[in-house]
Amino acid sequence: MHHQWLLLAACFWVIFMFMVASKFITLTFKDPDVYSAKQEFLFLTTMPEVRKLPEEKHIPEELKPTGKELPDSRLVQPLVYMERLELIRNVCRDDALKNLSHTPVSKFVLDRIFVCDKHKILFCQTPKVGNTQWKKVLIVLNGAFPSIEEIPENVVHDHEKNGLPRLSSFSDAEIQKRLKTYFKFFIVRDPFERLISAFKDKFVHNPRFEPWYRHEIAPGIIRKYRRNRTESRGIQFEDFVRYLGDPNHRWLDLQFGDHIIHWVTYVELCAPCEIMYSVIGHHETLEDDAPYILKEAGIDHLVSYPTIPPGITVYNRTKVEHYFLGISKRDIRRLYARFEGDFKLFGYQKPDFLLN
């Protein structure tokens, strides 16, 4: 019996030692690849990302902050308007463009310039470039109406009632004094897009019911410039382009009188080479230009420019291409030849997509 217990104890000891040795071998020779893979998985899924602190770098003295703000739109913006005026001066000095950029400061020009004596402002009217809104601003400033919203639409263009005197109504001495000392501005847009707007407004829609455009001016253009005399349609944009591009257009202009203000050049309207304007605004950037003009004129605390509908000032090349579709290159080139001064004076790109 005693021997049986000794044998059982010996077997138990052998089994115990075998288990210890097996555990030791397992711990010592585990597959490193399996372990490292498991650890990598845990690191990617459970460990938060630890970001290194930025290393301190040596900053050259001239690049260290000075406390001054970087240029923003309030500082950059005046440079845009200075560049516009400089471009006008350069084009005005170009003898090759003299016939397209210069015009006498005649009564026709002085009739286009409206006066706000109270705030010493002169505004040259360039129709089809949002001029109705600028007239409203000046009417309020002159005190004829307390707010823009209260001005009846029929009064805006009635110069006997709207309280806006024309510069031509003053004596020569008073005209010169105002031209030299007042804040002067006008607005431009792409010349060809303006012509499209004029054609639509006066010959297609005619929202102000001005029947003379359709019943007097349109027939005169058709008689002179329509190639197919048997065609009975009303005036087409092609007829309008031929009229405007004709070097001998002036004899018709004389018959049409002041109605031509809606399509003659900016040069003919405002004489930018003869009159030193303070600011030239662009229809395409009116959202920025309108507040800037009000500020420069010192009236931004008195009146605001009416809200501009989204997208209305954006240049629409597709529309331009549509209207000029089917018109001969010869007629388009003649049109550009007349308006080349406007394109160059105000920095508008030559419309090669129509000319070539």
From Swiss-Prot:
GO terms for biological process: androgen metabolic process; carbohydrate biosynthetic process; estrogen metabolic process; learning; long-term memory; proteoglycan biosynthetic process. Keywords: Carbohydrate metabolism, Glycoprotein, Golgi apparatus, Lipid metabolism, Membrane, Signal-anchor, Steroid metabolism, Transferase, Transmembrane, Transmembrane helix. The gene is CHST10. Pathway: Steroid metabolism; Protein modification; carbohydrate sulfation. It comes from Pongo abelii. It is an enzyme of class 2 (transferase). Its EC number is 2.8.2.-. The keyword ATP-binding does not apply. Belongs to the sulfotransferase 2 family. InterPro entries: Carb_sulfotrans_8-10, Sulfotransferase. It catalyses: 3-O-{beta-D-GlcA-(1->[3)-alpha-D-Xyl-(1->3)-beta-D-GlcA-(1->](n)-4)-beta-D-Xyl-(1->4)-Rib-ol-P-Rib-ol-P-3-beta-D-GalNAc-(1->3)-beta-D-GlcNAc-(1->4)-O-6-P-alpha-D-Man}-L-Thr-[protein] + 3'-phosphoadenylyl sulfate = 3-O-{O-3-S-beta-D-GlcA-(1->[3)-alpha-D-Xyl-(1->3)-beta-D-GlcA-(1->](n)-4)-beta-D-Xyl-(1->4)-Rib-ol-P-Rib-ol-P-3-beta-D-GalNAc-(1->3)-beta-D-GlcNAc-(1->4)-O-6-P-alpha-D-Man}-L-Thr-[protein] + adenosine 3',5'-bisphosphate + H(+); 17beta-estradiol 3-O-(beta-D-glucuronate) + 3'-phosphoadenylyl sulfate = 17beta-estradiol 3-O-(3-sulfo-beta-D-glucuronate) + adenosine 3',5'-bisphosphate + H(+); 17beta-estradiol 3-O-(beta-D-glucuronate) 17-sulfate + 3'-phosphoadenylyl sulfate = 17beta-estradiol 3-O-(3-sulfo-beta-D-glucuronate) 17-sulfate + adenosine 3',5'-bisphosphate + H(+); 17beta-estradiol 17-O-(beta-D-glucuronate) + 3'-phosphoadenylyl sulfate = 17beta-estradiol 17-O-(3-sulfo-beta-D-glucuronate) + adenosine 3',5'-bisphosphate + H(+). GO terms for cellular component: Golgi membrane. It is found in: Golgi apparatus membrane. This is Carbohydrate sulfotransferase 10. Residues 1-6 are cytoplasmic. It is a single-pass type II membrane protein. GO terms for molecular function: sulfotransferase activity. The chain crosses the membrane at residues 7-27. It comes from the Eukaryota. Glycans are attached at residues 99, 228, 316. 3'-phosphoadenylyl sulfate binds at residues 127-133, 189-197. Catalyzes the transfer of sulfate from 3'-phosphoadenylyl sulfate (PAPS) to position 3 of terminal glucuronic acid of both protein- and lipid-linked oligosaccharides. Participates in biosynthesis of HNK-1 carbohydrate structure 3-O-sulfo-beta-D-GlcA-(1->3)-beta-D-Gal-(1->4)-D-GlcNAc-R, a sulfated glucuronyl-lactosaminyl residue carried by many neural recognition molecules, which is involved in cell interactions during ontogenetic development and in synaptic plasticity in the adult. May be indirectly involved in synapse plasticity of the hippocampus, via its role in HNK-1 biosynthesis. Residues 28-356 are lumenal.
